[in-house]
Amino acid sequence: YCDFSKVFIKNQPVDSYLEHLLEEFQSYDIQKLRTLYIGGGTPTALSASQLEVLLKGLTKNLDLSVLEELTIEANPGDLDADKIAVLKNSAVNRVSLGVQTFDDKMLKKIGRSHLEKDIYENIDRLKLAGFDNISIDLIYALPGQTMDQVKENVAKAIGLDIPHMSLYSLILENHTVFMNRMRRGKLPLPKEELEAEMFEYIIAELERAGFEHYEISNFSKPGFESRHNLMYWDNAEYYGIGAGASGYVDGVRYKNHGPIRHYLSAVEEGNARITEEHLSQKEQMEEEMFLGLRKKSGVSMIRFEKKFGRSFEGLYGEIVRDLVQQGLMQIDGDRVRMTKRGLFLGDTVAERFILE
């Protein structure tokens, strides 16, 4: 279900990879960052000493007084006491755990190596080490999953007493085991109506527990929104570092070489990128809408006009009025945003903002 760049760590040149990744990072001469996010991939698969090399290398030239958030992703099965000690002694101030589900049978089915007990152990250890900004990822609409199982997962997640959760419905990516099984008719996924019911239940329960549904898939207690992801949904620019990473800098969307050995050679030659795409103003405006409408707060029409020097009304007025009439969008002052129904139909609504 996950199409990130991934490799088995065994027999991989891990130390050499870290060295090259840090070389790529340093080539940008970055001194000030508001957010840094390590993961999409699992950095805690590294040994404690390798993790320390990575964290020190990334932060040694950074002005930490302006770094608001440093998130690291972790697998519940990987976080031992040594690795937590490394995190504690670094600039990391937010940890995101790939829980996915609390059901041991389902974890095995989706190829995860951790168990439910590891989730509780890891969160207790992180809290004891002083981490209060903890997030978990959960997946719903898993193969054969029932509404009762979703209810149980949500109750257990709320019981963890953490300030942030990301909940994603299972999306099948090409070239993954799940997609191959579905094509062979061997994957009993919940029907769309049940998936919608699951999503509505999740929103209602988490809001009742004091979480704000601030983006299609994300819920937080006040003040604990993911700053890194908000920057991304605001269509701000970001560097992507490492094998298979994507970035968006100076109006250029780029992607790095994926296979590790190709990436190592590319860094040695002085350019890790395999593709670069210069976005036109039309494409930038479309992205502003696609990404911004994922947020509960939506898109500011004033900010849009300042950024692009174009009339929002002239470009999108008619489309917005039509979506408002259908109950999928609403206008609040200078902002346009999705209704709850619109959020569930996210991509279908966003497609209306493709400019001819």
Regions found by a protein language model. Name each.
Residues 335-339:
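Minor-groove-contacting beta-hairpin "wing" of winged helix-turn-helix DNA-binding domains
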Residues 310-324:
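Short amphipathic alpha-helical interaction segments
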Residues 7-28, 32-310:
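C-terminal scaffold of the Radical SAM
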Residues 324-334:
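A short, conserved structural fragment
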Residues 1-4:
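Local cysteine-cluster metal-coordination motifs and their immediate loop/turn environment
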Residues 341-356:
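Short, amphipathic alpha-helical interaction segments positioned at domain boundaries
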